[in-house]
């Protein structure tokens, strides 16, 4: 599995996570840091201490930077534009 395949797999896992109402009370940054950023201590620290909204914005920016914007599901689109 290539690095791109792994990124895509993690991205879709994250999409499933954020769109599942059972998980809305869990800090997205915590989940994201565990799955994406284990080796980047300073970024991981930021995620562990982020509020859900801050984490959402940071993650959405990361997705935009990595060209995933054409496939964002509706709930992420809503968060992206603050709806």
Map each language-model feature to its residues:
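N-terminal acidic leader/helix
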Residues: 2-30
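Low-complexity, intrinsically disordered short peptide segments enriched in small/polar/basic residues
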Residues: 1-3, 15, 56-57, 73
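Acidic, low-complexity, intrinsically disordered interaction modules
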Residues: 21-65
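Charged low-complexity stretches with an acidic bias
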Residues: 54-83
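Hydrophobic transmembrane signal anchors and adjacent membrane-proximal interface regions, especially
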Residues: 12, 16, 34, 42-45, ...
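Short, structured coil/loop segments at alpha-helix boundaries
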Residues: 4-7, 39-41, 69
């Amino acid at each position: 599995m290539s690095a791109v395949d792994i990124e895509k797999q993690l991205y879709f896992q994250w999409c499933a996570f954020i769109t599942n109402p059972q998980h809305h009370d869990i800090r997205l940054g915590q989940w994201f840091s565990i799955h994406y950023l284990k080796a980047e201590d300073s970024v991981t620290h930021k995620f562990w201490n982020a509020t859900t909204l801050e984490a959402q914005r940071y993650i959405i920016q990361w997705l935009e930077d990595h060209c995933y914007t054409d496939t964002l599901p509706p709930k992420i689109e809503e968060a992206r534009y603050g709806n």
